[in-house]
Regions:
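Non-catalytic substrate-recognition/targeting regions of SAM-dependent transferases
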Residues: 6-23, 29-96, 103
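Conserved alpha-helix/loop element of class I SAM-dependent methyltransferases that forms part
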Residues: 96-114
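Conserved class I S-adenosyl-L-methionine
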Residues: 113-124
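Conserved SAM-binding loop of SAM-dependent methyltransferases across substrates and taxa
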Residues: 125-137
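Conserved SAM-binding motif I beta-strand of class I
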Residues: 138-143
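S-adenosyl-L-methionine
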Residues: 145-191
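Mobile active-site "lid"/loop adjacent to the S-adenosyl-L-methionine
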Residues: 146-148, 170-174, 187-218
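Conserved beta-strand signature within the Rossmann-like core of class I S-adenosyl-L-methionine
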Residues: 226-230
């Protein structure tokens, strides 16, 4: 198992009872989320200036309980800067555990000895996009959400990467890949983090069970390497 332990602004404190307790440095605040494994323990009280907890709900969403939490803040990973804010469904706009993947493919890109073209599908707020661009890759960033692509651009600007060769696209990932095949375009690597459920830019419903198999069959036709970031 790879452990994302190089963060200065983030730490996993506990994993128990189907929840996860995390420390995010703003001042300091803590978050407890569902969907992790471990032995149940008693709830911990946060000793920092701002406390945030996501509580288990009947549905997967959960909710935030917080005091003095800003609407937006920044955290840093090496030379990358990310703008975060709490969502109602217990996300912050970043999955810090993915940093181990960023390090892995960043080393591959830097050591390739030639220009590398990367396609990042379901690219969200751009963590993998920025890591690949910072390592020297030409990146095509595709996400169905206009808001998420705009957020990713903000992260790029905050990281000093606005002038890097990043192509920002709001598009249906499956349809985009199908068009790229017809165009004869190729990439050296593909990164994807598909959601289990979502909607396309025109309201199309995405459920991972069906289109994902088709998407894999498409990318295997012309991509040299596939890396899953989930």
């Amino acid at each position: 198992m790879w452990i994302a332990d190089k963060w200065k602004d983030y730490e996993v404190i506990d994993c128990s009872g189907g929840e996860k307790l995390e420390r995010w440095v703003i001042t300091h605040w803590y978050a407890r989320t569902r969907r992790s494994s471990g032995i149940p323990r008693k709830k911990k009280k946060a000793g920092s200036i701002g406390t945030v907890t996501t509580t288990a709900a009947k549905k997967a969403g959960g909710e935030w309980e917080f005091f003095d939490l800003p609407e937006q803040w920044q955290i840093h990973y090496g030379e990358l800067t990310f703008n975060l804010k709490p969502f109602s469904f217990k996300h912050t706009g970043l999955f810090p555990e993915q940093a181990t993947n960023w390090d892995w493919f960043g080393d591959k890109i830097r050591n390739a000895g030639r220009p590398i073209k990367v396609l990042n599908l379901f690219a969200y707020t751009g963590g993998a996009t920025l890591a690949a661009a910072a390592a020297g890759a030409h990146v095509t960033h595709v996400d169905a959400s206009k808001g998420m692509v705009a957020w990713a651009k903000e992260n790029a600007a905050s990281s000093g990467l606005s002038d890097k060769p990043i192509r920002w696209l709001v598009d249906d990932c499956v349809k985009f890949v199908e068009r790229e095949i017809r165009r004869g375009n190729h990439y050296d690597a593909i990164i994807m983090d598909p959601p289990s459920y979502g909607r396309g830019p025109k309201g199309e419903i995405w459920k991972i069970e069906m289109p994902f198999i088709h998407l894999l069959s498409c990318v295997l036709r012309f991509f040299l390497r596939i890396h899953f970031s989930s």
